[in-house]
Regions:
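Hydrophobic, lipid-facing positions within transmembrane beta-strands of outer-membrane proteins
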Residues: 177, 203-209
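Periplasmic polypeptide-binding modules associated with outer-membrane biogenesis and secretion
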Residues: 1-199
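Cytosolic catalytic cores of cyclic-nucleotide second-messenger enzymes
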Residues: 228
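Structural signature of outer-membrane beta-barrel channels/translocons
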Residues: 184-186, 210-216
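Conserved small/polar residues in nucleotide/adenosyl-binding loops
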Residues: 217-224
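Transmembrane beta-barrel strands of outer-membrane/channel proteins
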Residues: 193-197, 207-211, 220
């Protein structure tokens, strides 16, 4: 493994016990690739957002012992300097269109997030911040980024919802990555289920479902972003 001389190599060294490469194990390309992926994931969850598996190289020596390979892992030379820098979360900006795409835009600030929205936009007060696990100032984590995207997508109230970070060509020496979330509300489908529970001949309780009228879980008819 690389000598722990800087942030990224110290991080790699700290998890050698979790390595997928073991002395005496069979030498194969799949194991080498899996270890690259493990380290890249570790790095990207600890601020090194631009680190990639291909930035890790192996030097193999087969001359020391018969039928054995001595491996040395190194960080590839000439990779972008941004890949070796740990970032924190910067600003989180949200832009939401209403379901019609028409209306006046307004802006609110809520829990360290800036939200521009198109009126009328009816959502619960906590819907966005409670589903975004990234927070300004914390070490940037790709897992938290993916979790935020998944949480928002699973709400089922957006026609689309996209999460992007500062492009690599726009960093200009910055220590943080800004997050931009863009979305549009979907046209609400109004429905509810009426449950008719009845006893079956086999003594088990079975439901009879009747498709009916209106039910909102995340949308409120009279709560707008102005109420947040």
């Amino acid at each position: 493994y690389p000598k722990p001389t800087d942030g990224i190599t110290q991080l790699i060294d700290s998890t050698k016990a979790q390595s997928l490469l073991r002395v005496g194990a069979q030498y194969n390309a799949d194991s080498l690739s899996a270890e690259r992926t493990r380290i890249a994931t570790l790095a990207r969850n600890n601020g090194y957002y631009y680190f990639r598996p291909e930035y890790i190289e192996y030097l193999a020596d087969t001359t020391q012992e018969h039928l054995k390979v001595n491996l040395r892992m190194i960080i590839k030379k000439g990779i972008p300097t941004m890949a070796l820098k740990a970032y924190t979360v910067g600003k989180i900006d949200i832009s939401l269109q209403n379901s019609t795409g028409k209306g006046i835009w307004d802006t609110i600030y809520y829990k360290d997030m800036k939200m521009a929205y198109q009126k009328p936009l009816r959502v619960k007060q906590s819907i966005m911040p409670s589903n975004i696990t990234l927070r300004p100032g914390q070490v940037y984590s790709v897992t938290e980024q993916d979790q935020s995207q998944t949480n928002l997508s699973r709400l089922g109230i957006f026609r689309y919802i996209n999460l992007n970070v500062t492009p690599i060509d726009s960093l200009r020496g910055a220590d943080s990555l800004n997050v931009q979330i863009d979305g549009a509300m979907d046209i609400p489908l109004e429905s509810e289920f009426e449950i008719d529970v009845s006893s079956k001949s086999n003594s088990f309780i079975g439901p009879g479902m009747i498709f009916g009228a209106v039910s909102y879980t995340h949308l409120r008819a009279h709560e707008t972003c102005a109420d947040l």
